[in-house]
Swiss-Prot record:
It comes from Bos taurus (Bovine). It comes from the Eukaryota. Transmembrane segments: none annotated. The modification Phosphoserine is found at residue 427. GO terms for cellular component: cytosol; Golgi apparatus. The keyword Transmembrane helix does not apply. Belongs to the Rab GDI family. Regulates the GDP/GTP exchange reaction of most Rab proteins by inhibiting the dissociation of GDP from them, and the subsequent binding of GTP to them. Promotes the dissociation of GDP-bound Rab proteins from the membrane and inhibits their activation. Promotes the dissociation of RAB1A, RAB3A, RAB5A and RAB10 from membranes. The gene is GDI1. Keywords: Cytoplasm, Golgi apparatus, GTPase activation, Phosphoprotein. InterPro entries: FAD/NAD-bd_sf, GDP_dissociation_inhibitor, RabGDI. GO terms for biological process: negative regulation of axonogenesis; negative regulation of protein targeting to membrane; protein transport; Rab protein signal transduction; vesicle-mediated transport. Signal peptide: none annotated. This is Rab GDP dissociation inhibitor alpha. The lineage of its organism: Eukaryota, Metazoa, Chordata, Craniata, Vertebrata. Its main location: cytoplasm.
Amino acid sequence: MDEEYDVIVLGTGLTECILSGIMSVNGKKVLHMDRNPYYGGESSSITPLEELYKRFQLLEGPPETMGRGRDWNVDLIPKFLMANGQLVKMLLYTEVTRYLDFKVVEGSFVYKGGKIYKVPSTETEALASNLMGMFEKRRFRKFLVFVANFDENDPKTFEGVDPQNTSMRDVYRKFDLGQDVIDFTGHALALYRTDDYLDQPCLETINRIKLYSESLARYGKSPYLYPLYGLGELPQGFARLSAIYGGTYMLNKPVDDIIMENGKVVGVKSEGEVARCKQLICDPSYVPDRVRKAGQVIRIICILSHPIKNTNDANSCQIIIPQNQVNRKSDIYVCMISYAHNVAAQGKYIAIASTTVETTDPEKEVEPALELLEPIDQKFVAISDLYEPIDDGSESQVFCSCSYDATTHFETTCNDIKDIYKRMAGSAFDFENMKRKQNDVFGEADQ
């Protein structure tokens, strides 16, 4: 332990493990420690099921009807991967795909007027969908064609829209789209949590809708992927990568002190020994004095013995409840996976409802989601504070990650990773020099 390292990483959450992997691949000497005896930090998957009951202080433990405890891997933070998104690119860049198996999530649904509807995944589905009327569909189709053809480097595709200045509200107006379609587009396709985006320049939204449709085009049923055995596999995959490139891992290792000299990090003290470093990466729990609270998220893990109604018996799906439908500022999300992903006992389903907390009664806020899931065998309620670093780490060289937000995908996490990388390395993280030229997370075989 008494050694010099380029980088010390504290905590084995996904953000920390990806950065540790990338730094190791780039030739840095990395020491990675976690005070917990397991990988994943906030983003771990809990197994066996008995462990989840203990974690939530349910002392009676799981009933026999839950099957074998070790058949369960329950994510604490529910998220899916966008098939064409940044995390999949990072998995390919680092070849971590070889340690993981993915399944396509079977469907994406959106809530409207108390019911759920499938988010159309083909033009035929869009034309047959009950989400909108006939004339609305034609206008929506025109809008989608505009988005598909839009190229920020080719003004001929702009159709009078200025990507840097025209607001998204004005683009919707240009295509004469109604409120329901705007809700659906902004929240189920562009995946915004609130409506703040409406008055921002439209380029970001157009690119988000493009990401959705490109991800969808990849595997057909939905734009989302999910790893077998749960999301806890992701940090472990990147940890293996770091180890292959010479990274040193220590779990169950308490951190006594972060040692600073002249306002700059020089090492970490653990169990009486000091490891020295030039830079430090950590999650907020290791540096409470360097973070501020930026809100709260409620996540309710629900165990079910049935698929969710009106999802065509899907064994995995996402449901988005746009904020306007339930008089809120932020959307409510449901991620559902099941025994088909080796995360639950045979015939069991795990549905996790989550949202950004807006009131003093967070459980009441997610009620519209829970109503869709009834009957629920068991609920586990977690309310987490969201933290963000108070500075960019340039002086202290202590780079702290942000807490995982309420979104159901990893794009915001990847933005944080790229941002930390840029601050540490002084240059942008570049996807283009990916080591592996295969372009498919399933390897060569079609799924």
